[in-house]
Amino acid sequence: MWYSRAVNPAKLLEFLRSHRLAVQASISPNAGPQAAVVGFAISDQFEIIFDTLETTRKAQNLRNNPHIALVIGGLTAGDERTVQYEGIADEPTGADLQRLKQIYYSAYPDGPSRAAWPGLIYIRAKPTWVRYSDYNQNPPEIVELRAEDLTA
């Protein structure tokens, strides 16, 4: 395998924006794993945003322990590219929330209709580590990035 730190952040953003779903993982209060599929959008700063109800396990887990992991891609036959994403989650407020909602609504035009749901919240993940893997190549391209590497 070929490991590198020389991926173009714009290329990584393009890959992430070509996907709408991610498997999101969090840690339950009793230290057990919990995973769910979420629809997400991504900012130019590699922040992932998704909505959920505050009563969901993922919301409760992330309020208790903000460490989050997501896997994106790898589900399309013939396309063996994936991103593993680790970060810290929060519930943005104020101007940050408004900015991220606009990004989310651009990806999900039905998002504003859900905004009126009782208990709907928005979760933001800020990256701490990202691994892009392209197994379509031989040898595979594996790129690991830290938050400081992710400037678009």
Q: For each of these PLM feature ranges, what is it?
A:
Residues 2-7, 79-152:
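Charged, gly/pro-rich active-site loop segments
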Residues 19-54, 60-62, 68-73, 81-85:
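Short beta-strand segments
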